[in-house]
Amino acid sequence: MRIAVIGATGLVGSVMLKVLEERELQVDELFPVGSEASIGKKVKFRGKDVSVLGVAQVVSLKPDVALFSAGADVSREWAPKFVAVGTKVIDNSSAWRMDADKKLVVPEVNGHVLTRDDRIIANPNCSTIQLVMVLKELHELLGIKRVVVSTYQSVTGTGSKGVRQLESERNGEAVTEAAYPHPIDKNCIPHCDDFLENGYTKEEMKLVNESGKILGIPDLKLTATSVRIPVSVGHSESVNIEFQRTPELNEIRLKLGKAVGISVVDDPTNNLYPMPVTSEAKDAVFVGRIRLDESQPNSVNLWIVADNLRKGAATNAVQILELLQEKSPINS
């Protein structure tokens, strides 16, 4: 299989290369794509140096699959051009997620919706992926009535600029290009992406809209608050879920414990619960602090953590590719 990675020198793109290396997909040719400033640079893939190419050149090479992680503007411009030459596109940006004609996929949740005819498949927002992994299991078990989620998101969710700002502030250096309107070190900023007229941010509304689409519940009652925190990798979520029937904690732990891609870490008496530092570089979604909400009936609180660069982005995209291969093998 001939695979292009658009944005290969960025945070998510570089992790995509790692994930492709780790998994058993056959990669006959790799085309790393970067900005004009990156063309000619080398990236490592399976022990070899591979030159970064320009996107127009790679379109002409007609790869079998293109994994996009270069922002919505790049995806809107170039994804259709790849499709026109027969390439299947898996896009990590927000460009196509809410397009009625495009699938928005988390393989463990709604992988069944993929078909061999899909040409552009959208990869959900990082915070959405880890949330719906858990919501899907609990909706099957108890029926979800309402969800309240607060997210605590690492600076890698903003890209290299966010990482540089945090590192500069921690090192006492001047910030030459700020990713945030306020200092991020020793701070929490309740401002992820732009604010909308309804008072929510785009990030918060992504959680609302994408979750409903993925779960097949267009009228899902979900409200969100998203906060940027001074952590390098890993998004955390405090989630309150109201169910249609009375939950039992043991059945919740059992259901989540059996779910593919979910790891239950819930032993607070021994200080065991999910944390960004223990989820980094792992593909699982970690769940803990599972407890009844004593303020209202039929409700639980829980805590979800995942590596936003892996399951929240790169790994999920590669899993979509693997699922496409199962449904319609691509043989170069």
Region roles according to the model:
Residues M1-I184, D219-K221, V285-F286, I290-Q296, ...:
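N-terminal Rossmann-like NAD(P) cofactor-binding subdomain of oxidoreductases
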